[in-house]
Amino acid sequence: MASSPVAPVVLVILDGWGYREETYGNAIASAYTPVIDSLWQAYPHTLIHTSGKAVGLPKGQMGNSEVGHLNIGAGRIVPQELVRISDAVEEGSLFSNPVLVRLCQTVKERNGKLHFIGLCSAGGVHSHIDHLYGLVELAKRHGLPACIHVITDGRDTPPRDAAGVLEELEQRLKTSGCGRIVTVSGRYYAMDRDRRWERTEAAYRVMTSNEHIQPLRAVDVARQSYAQDIGDEFIVPTRIAAGAVEPGDGVVFFNFRPDRARQLTQAFIDPNFSGFERALITPLDFVTFTQYDASFNCGVAFPPQNLSHILGEVIAEHGLKQLRAAETEKYAHVTYFFNGGLEEPFPGEDRILIPSPMVTTYDQAPAMSALAVTQAVKKAIEKQEYALVVVNFANSDMVGHTGKLAATIQAIETVDRCVGVLVEAATKVGGTLLITADHGNAEYMIDEDGNPWTAHTTNPVPFILVEGEKRKVPGHGGHVILRKDGCLADIAPTILEILELPQPLEMTGRSLIVSAPYEMRLNRTPVSLKI
């Protein structure tokens, strides 16, 4: 490791900070953001794509934090699990998947039941309802009773979307003649990722007990919740029919995104589980759609795709130090997802985890832990040890998901101030900053009907290059512009160019930096900026 002072490249990821011209319902346009506004005016900037085919998703599919960080860290467009699994359903290879076939055979030999647990929506961020329909057909082909444990969305979809989804699901099950909905739980409970075990427990108890059955249709559970002003995300776990997870059964958790599926999975499979009191259900065959954690002892229907020569790996191979920093809500994204699904850090990779505030929803604490993250990263920059610093600010995404416009504006203004601190710290040591986002959210919070919008968007995001005195852009100096057709996969090649490191062949992204035309250089006026 180099001992001389290092001028870092600082990648600042403003989670959920999209770009949209329209100001109505736009928390970012409504907020007071003097730092970002000044940087946008003074430095090379562009808009980049973060959704659909630009990040390996189907055309028109909104991006998300997992996909965003995966593409940024990989330096290439990574085909996403949504596409991979959807293709398996459409082409029929799902029905010959060896892990799923073996599960069905084992359950049938035991005269057990097959359970499908997952987020039931077309959001495409954590799961897709079409994948459940494929699983129901799988159960039908094997002559197995299928018990469906619905997790309702309301976060990656409109807050009251579940009623329509459940109506269609009930009709599809009736037509199929296979499968029944036995429990309904909001994702707030079943998909917690912050070790609020009381939430996970509420969903787990309903799924594993036939007590307290409320003889309702699933759609009626949603409608009764709406009548109490409870949206899909917060539907209280409810059992509506017999069909608890019991010894001899098999389970498929069909979420493909790992982070919010881990806690509930642990409760089912971990013999040393300590989140809450429960007896381990055994024998129980448990399959997850993707690998939720390398340490989990369960089947995986779609094993991970290996990515080689990603950004963190290249930095480490050249003997340089790097730092990843975020609060709890986005820590996995700057580490696990940024590193292509690897849990272990690369040599020379340090990590800073700042706990997120323990509140029910983040509109109650719009600043979240941004100030603490900022101070920790500022100190790290001042050490001049790291060639690359990656920091994520969760506020505009996490508060944006609440649908509370005023709170989201506060969140954005907090982040703007934090960016100012990091710009000052980085430029003081000659470092260069790249300021961008992983997907849109907070720029669109009210839909065309005037209702709160809590999901992500397909809008582009800003990308700003703040060039430092000791970390100049090679061969260009101040005479640079940024391409207009870029995407998240282009960020890693841009960083490598600034660090003067070779771009591996596996990295198919292209640097966003291009030389400005001669005429533009002549007309460019130097800007004096003080933050």
UniProtKB/Swiss-Prot annotation:
- Please state what class of enzyme this protein is: isomerase
Leader sequence range is none
Top-level division of the source organism's lineage: Bacteria
| Cofactor names | Mn(2+)
Q: Which SUPFAM superfamilies match?
A: 2,3-Bisphosphoglycerate-independent phosphoglycerate mutase, substrate-binding domain, Alkaline phosphatase-like
Show the Pfam families listed in the entry: iPGM_N, Metalloenzyme
One cellular component term from this protein's GO annotations in UniProt: cytosol
Sorted UniProt keywords: Glycolysis, Isomerase, Manganese, Metal-binding
Give this protein's Gene Ontology molecular function annotations.
Answer: manganese ion binding; phosphoglycerate mutase activity
Pathway it works in: Carbohydrate degradation; glycolysis; pyruvate from D-glyceraldehyde 3-phosphate: step 3/5
InterPro entries attached here?
Alkaline_phosphatase_core_sf (IPR017850), BPG-indep_PGM_N (IPR011258), Metalloenzyme (IPR006124), PGAM_B_sf (IPR036646), Pgm_bpd_ind (IPR005995)
Active-site positions on this chain? 65 (phosphoserine intermediate)
Return the EC number.
Answer: 5.4.2.12
User: Where along this sequence does the record place binding of Mn(2+) 2?
Assistant: 15, 65, 438-439
Instruction: Summarize where Mn(2+) 1 binds, as residue positions.
Output: 397, 401, 456
Q: How is the cofactor bound?
A: Binds 2 manganese ions per subunit.
| One Gene Ontology biological process | glucose catabolic process
Catalysed reactions listed for this entry: (2R)-2-phosphoglycerate = (2R)-3-phosphoglycerate
What residues bind substrate, as annotated? 126, 155-156, 187, 193, 257-260, 330
> What does the similarity note say?
Belongs to the BPG-independent phosphoglycerate mutase family.
What quaternary arrangement does the UniProt entry report? Answer: Monomer.
Functionally, this protein is described as follows: Catalyzes the interconversion of 2-phosphoglycerate and 3-phosphoglycerate.
> By what name is this protein known?
2,3-bisphosphoglycerate-independent phosphoglycerate mutase
Native species: Thermosynechococcus vestitus (strain NIES-2133 / IAM M-273 / BP-1)
The gene designation is gpmI
